[in-house]
C-alpha cells in the first residue's frame, strides 16, 4: 500500500454486542469497546481499515448481485468518502462499472464467544491476492499461482487453472521443499472413492 501515491484514510468500525445475547444490560461492563475492537474474525474487516485511492479491494458480502456486487468481487478504489466508498469493478460481468459501497452491519457466522458481535464497517478487504476457493466462478486475464506445497484437495488445480481466459495469462510458481520431483504438482485422484 505504501507504493501507491496519495493520502491514506483510516476507517474505524462501530462494534457492539447484539442485545439478544446480553445478560440484563451488563454488556458494557463485561465487554469494553476496546476489547470488541480488538477481535478479528474471518470474512469480516478489522476494526481499523486503512485504504487509499487506487488500492485493489475485495467485497466480503453480497450487496446487490444484479449490479455485480457479490462476495469476492474485486474493485479498485476511486474515492474515499465519509459515508461511502466509490470503486470501479475489475472482475466479473460488470467490469468497468462504478459502484458505491456503504457501511453495513456484519456478524461472524462462527464464534466461540458467549455473545454475538455486530460490526458496522465497509465490507471490503485489501486484495492483492486471493485464495483458489475465493477465485472460483471468476474469469481473469492474468493468474499468478503460488504453490508453496501440494494442493490439499482434488480439483483445486483445475479451479485455479480454469480461472484464466488465455493460456499466456497463466504463471505458476512451485516451491515445495518436501517434494523430491522438480517442478511437479500432483493433482491426486483416489479412484477408490468412485
Feature-to-residue mapping (PLM):
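RecA-like helicase/translocase P-loop NTPase motor core
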Residues: 1-194
Amino acid at each position: 500500500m505504501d507504493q501507491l501515491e496519495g493520502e491514506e484514510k483510516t476507517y474505524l468500525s462501530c462494534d457492539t454486542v447484539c442485545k439478544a445475547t446480553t445478560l440484563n444490560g451488563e454488556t458494557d461492563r463485561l465487554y469494553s469497546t476496546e476489547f470488541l475492537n480488538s477481535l478479528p474474525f474471518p470474512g469480516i474487516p478489522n476494526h481499523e481499515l486503512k485504504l487509499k485511492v487506487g488500492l485493489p479491494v475485495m467485497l466480503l458480502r453480497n450487496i446487490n448481485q444484479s449490479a455485480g456486487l457479490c462476495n469476492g468481487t474485486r474493485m479498485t478504489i476511486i474515492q474515499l468518502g465519509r459515508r461511502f466508498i466509490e470503486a470501479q469493478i475489475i472482475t466479473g460481468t460488470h467490469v468497468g462499472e462504478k459502484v458505491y459501497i456503504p457501511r453495513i452491519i456484519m456478524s461472524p457466522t462462527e464464534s466461540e464467544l458467549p455473545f454475538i458481535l455486530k460490526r458496522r464497517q465497509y465490507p471490503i478487504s485489501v486484495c492483492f491476492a486471493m485464495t483458489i476457493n475465493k477465485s472460483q466462478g471468476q474469469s481473469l486475464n492474468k493468474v499468478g499461482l503460488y504453490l508453496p506445497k501440494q494442493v490439499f484437495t482434488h480439483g483445486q488445480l483445475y479451479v485455479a487453472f480454469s480461472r484464466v481466459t488465455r493460456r499466456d495469462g497463466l504463471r505458476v510458481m512451485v516451491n515445495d521443499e518436501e517434494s523430491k520431483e522438480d517442478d511437479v504438482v500432483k493433482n491426486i485422484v483416489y479412484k477408490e472413492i468412485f
